[in-house]
């Protein structure tokens, strides 16, 4: 007998399937007749994908500048896995690890190459903060938690050190089994061409569609040749929207040139979650639908491609044996004015609305799902939401 059965779930290709869960894993797909302790009848009204993965968040609660709670940026918004992108370094990653053990959301970390992490904006201005031995020891202490490294390569961070911190980061990467390296780009120096030329296959450029002068497009609106070469080597592009790092103009132009992101991520923390312009991963994903990406393309960027980029081998796919991490959502026709980090706006016809998440077989209504469950009975989705609330095992409101 299965623990949970989702019947007639709609996939992003609009096919319908049953999904069975047992012992925290996906146990069966297709037309399923076997019994289950709990059954949720979705009747094709709700999309189900592999659990959404946000490849770039800041959720170390004790960070003095970029902080949030893992479940506030994760399970409450339909995101089952988050990767904190460099909030902690070797000095405070142990504390972060312990705090994440209490979260419903699966949390991983990209370790800041600065041992002090993000205690200030200029963590790489002092080269003494880059301690290769401390990084190696931290990775050895937390091999299943630290899934990569993070280096922020913009002028306010590196000070007078230019490209040198990135050269050190690449050496540290080689000493740690070539863990994925995420590199933040922003204002120069260092120049983006210098940064891109140092990167190799599997490295990740985050804030790839930022609107700053040091962007991936040249003044003529064409892709920089250094980025073309980097992509040919297997370097990956991550959105990392954030407060100041996403431009509709740059994203539209790049995507028109065929330069799509490998991963869509939020760079969310408490301030840009509450005050915008980020709000949630779902809203960032909706911006890419508005720009012209298809629903399957967008979902791939937060599931299979995100898992592959960070070597999360048990996540990102709706396949038997994978973790039972699922996001239940709908694509709603709701004209919405979306805003980027440059304060430019774009009218969207449709937005993604996460209703519930299942993490390792445990179910949670999202904040939006909970709010809509309190709808009037005439609402066309009310019966479905009631079914979700009644059917999900161990629905937990602890993240609120």
Where are the regions that the model predicts?
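Divalent-metal coordination cores built from histidine and acidic residues
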Residues: 72-154
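Active-site gating loops and adjacent loop-to-helix segments of metal-dependent hydrolytic enzymes
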Residues: 50, 75-80, 111-128, 194-212, ...
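Active-site core of metal-dependent hydrolases
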Residues: 151-254, 258-275
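Divalent metal-coordination and catalytic microenvironments
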Residues: 9, 24, 45, 56, ...
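A conserved glycine-rich beta-strand in the N-terminal activation segment of trypsin-fold
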Residues: 14-21
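C-terminal cap of metal-dependent C-N hydrolases
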Residues: 323-377
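His/Asp/Glu-enriched, well-ordered alpha-helical/loop segment
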Residues: 249-331
């Amino acid at each position: 007998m299965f623990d949970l059965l989702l019947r007639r779930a709609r996939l992003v290709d609009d096919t319908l399937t049953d999904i069975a869960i047992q012992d925290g894993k996906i146990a069966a797909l297709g037309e399923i007749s076997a019994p289950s302790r709990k059954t949720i009848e979705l009747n094709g009204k709700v999309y189900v994908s592999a659990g959404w993965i946000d490849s770039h968040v800041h959720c170390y609660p004790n960070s003095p500048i970029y902080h949030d709670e893992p479940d506030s940026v994760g399970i409450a918004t339909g995101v089952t896995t988050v990767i904190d992108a460099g909030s902690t370094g070797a000095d405070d990653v142990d504390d972060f690890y312990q705090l994440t053990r209490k979260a419903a959301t699966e949390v991983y970390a990209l370790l800041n190459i600065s041992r002090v992490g993000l205690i200030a904006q200029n963590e790489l201005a002092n080269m003494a903060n880059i301690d290769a031995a401390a990084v190696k020891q931290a990775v050895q202490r937390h091999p299943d938690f630290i899934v990569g490294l993070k280096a922020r390569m913009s002028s306010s961070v590196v000070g007078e050190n230019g490209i040198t911190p990135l050269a050190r980061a690449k050496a540290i990467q080689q000493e740690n089994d070539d863990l994925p390296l995420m590199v933040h780009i922003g204002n120069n120096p260092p120049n983006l061409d210098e940064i891109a030329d140092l990167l190799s296959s599997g490295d990740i450029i985050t804030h790839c569609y930022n609107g700053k002068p040091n962007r991936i497009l040249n003044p003529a609106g064409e892709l920089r040749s250094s980025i073309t070469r980097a992509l040919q080597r297997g370097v990956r592009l991550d959105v990392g929207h954030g407060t100041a790092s996403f431009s509709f103009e740059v994203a539209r132009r790049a995507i028109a040139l065929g330069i799509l992101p490998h991963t869509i991520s939020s760079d969310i923390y408490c301030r840009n979650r509450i005050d915008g312009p980020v709000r949630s991963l779902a809203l960032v994903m909706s911006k890419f639908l508005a720009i012209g990406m298809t629903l399957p393309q967008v979902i791939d960027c937060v599931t299979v491609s995100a898992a592959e980029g960070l070597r999360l081998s048990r996540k990102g796919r709706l396949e038997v044996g994978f973790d039972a991490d699922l996001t239940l959502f709908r694509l709603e026709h709701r004209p919405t004015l979306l805003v980027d980090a440059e304060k430019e706006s774009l009218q969207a016809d449709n937005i993604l609305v996460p209703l519930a998440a299942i993490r390792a077989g445990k179910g949670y209504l999202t904040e939006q799902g909970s709010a809509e469950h309190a709808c009037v009975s005439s609402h066309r989705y009310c019966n479905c939401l009631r079914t979700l609330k009644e059917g999900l095992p161990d629905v937990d409101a602890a993240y609120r």
